[in-house]
């Protein structure tokens, strides 16, 4: 729903969504040519990929055929593809490649790893990383947090329309440690735990300024279970007020 509001496909009951100071509800060409939405479910016409590109790329001034070929290569595909002969997972790879090749400044992706097999998910991470730049914002909505935790630089966690967490990954990792341990004493100090084969995954206060990779599953569980405690770690005054 949030992504559809951001793209102007849904209209908010209150307030408005702006993109470069323009209300997205107006659906102006100058707005539409600079954003792209990859929905969770979609259909592609039974035509060749070359024809699809010829029909749709003119709507996006910054589309690059060279980029399209590069992104397809990540998924071991090429331009000589008949869209009607593809599986759902293959169609998603083609559509995401086209989306990234449009070079819009805003790319919205809803559950992009759904329908991808294990090799496809690994390819997806490399694919997204290759398309990142300072000129582009990529917003990914997902419940498959393990598929994307290593490519994010900012995390937004929402629950029933309430924003519980909105922080850069660097800030999060400076506040918390994410480790796996069977140490019972260490487990007692954890903010949040999840069972693992070797004991527990632990989310701990980062009191020694150590560096660990973010565990989104732990962070998500902790934020939903104790939102006030997590908010206080970043914004103490919010709780005091």
Where are these regions (language model features)?
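Conserved ABC transporter NBD signature motif
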Residues: 15-26, 30-31
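Helical segment within the ABC ATPase nucleotide-binding domain
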Residues: 121-134
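Catalytic Walker B motif of ABC-type/P-loop ATPase nucleotide-binding domains
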Residues: 107-111, 116
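ABC-family P-loop ATPase nucleotide-binding domains
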Residues: 37-94
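Helix-to-loop junction immediately C-terminal to a conserved catalytic motif
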Residues: 7
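C-terminal coupling/interaction segments
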Residues: 192-241
């Amino acid at each position: 729903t949030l992504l559809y509001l951001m793209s102007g496909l849904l209209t908010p009951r209150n307030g408005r969504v702006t993109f470069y100071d323009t209300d997205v509800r107006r659906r102006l060409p100058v707005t539409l040519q600079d954003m792209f939405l990859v929905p969770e479910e979609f259909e592609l016409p039974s035509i060749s990929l070359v024809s699809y590109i010829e029909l749709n790329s003119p709507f996006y001034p910054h589309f690059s055929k060279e980029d399209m070929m590069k992104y397809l290569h990540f998924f071991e595909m090429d331009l000589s593809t008949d869209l009607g002969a593809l599986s759902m997972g293959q169609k998603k790879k083609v559509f995401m490649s086209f989306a990234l090749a449009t070079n819009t400044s805003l790319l919205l992706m809803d559950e992009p790893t759904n329908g991808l097999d294990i090799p496809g998910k690994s390819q997806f991470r490399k694919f997204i990383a290759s398309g990142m730049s300072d000129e582009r914002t990529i917003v990914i909505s997902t419940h498959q947090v393990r598929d994307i935790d290593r490519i994010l630089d900012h995390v937004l966690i929402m629950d029933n329309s309430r924003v519980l967490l909105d922080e850069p990954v660097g800030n999060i990792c400076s506040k918390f440690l994410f480790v796996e341990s069977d140490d019972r004493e260490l487990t007692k100090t954890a903010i949040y735990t999840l069972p693992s084969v070797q004991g527990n995954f632990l989310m701990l206060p980062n009191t020694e300024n150590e560096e660990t990779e973010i565990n989104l599953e732990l962070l998500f569980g902790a934020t939903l279970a104790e939102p006030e405690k997590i908010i206080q770690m970043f914004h103490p005054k919010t709780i005091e007020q």
